[in-house]
Regions:
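Ligand-binding pockets and gating/stacking loops
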Residues: 1-147
Length: 147
């Protein structure tokens, strides 16, 4: 089974501080409660919880007190489902603008997620047009992340 939850409204090109002051506590409480609830019910070890976005944010505040889209660095949080507890991988430079240590690409994230979910990431599927398509194009399983 898979559940996808969307908590939108994070596209803060302006007034990022005011927006975060309202949104971040709501998100923190919901995320912490979900992890705690899954743990209390004995479900966390077999449930992968992931928080991500499709891109990061510019390292510097823009002219309207916000941040714009930035593809070079962003964070992902993963819990349960065979992931190490408290593990932090990689680092950005001092400005948060470029990878500084141990960069990971989307294909690495996908391949790792598929591994813990028991999905063969090497499998090819056929497109509607009859063309074979790799589930993941390249990438590596991030074994350091696994419990």
């Amino acid at each position: 089974r898979m559940v996808s939850v969307t908590f939108g409204g994070w596209d803060h090109h302006s007034n990022i501080k005011g927006a975060f002051d309202g949104q971040a506590p709501q998100f923190d409480q919901a995320f912490a409660r979900l992890i705690t609830d899954l743990q209390d019910r004995g479900m966390l070890k077999r449930t992968l919880v992931m928080v991500s976005s499709e891109f990061g944010r510019t390292p510097k505040i823009n002219g309207t007190n916000g941040r714009d889209h930035w593809p070079r660095v962003f964070s992902v949080a993963m819990a349960g489902g065979g992931m190490k507890e408290g593990y932090i991988h990689g680092a950005s430079d001092a400005l948060g603008g470029e990878p500084d240590r141990d960069p990971v690409g989307p294909e690495d994230l996908a391949k790792t997620m598929y591994r813990v979910l028991g999905i063969n990431a090497e499998k090819r599927i056929m497109s509607d047009g009859g063309r074979p398509v790799d589930i993941v194009n390249g990438g590596r399983v991030m074994t350091d992340w696994l419990a």
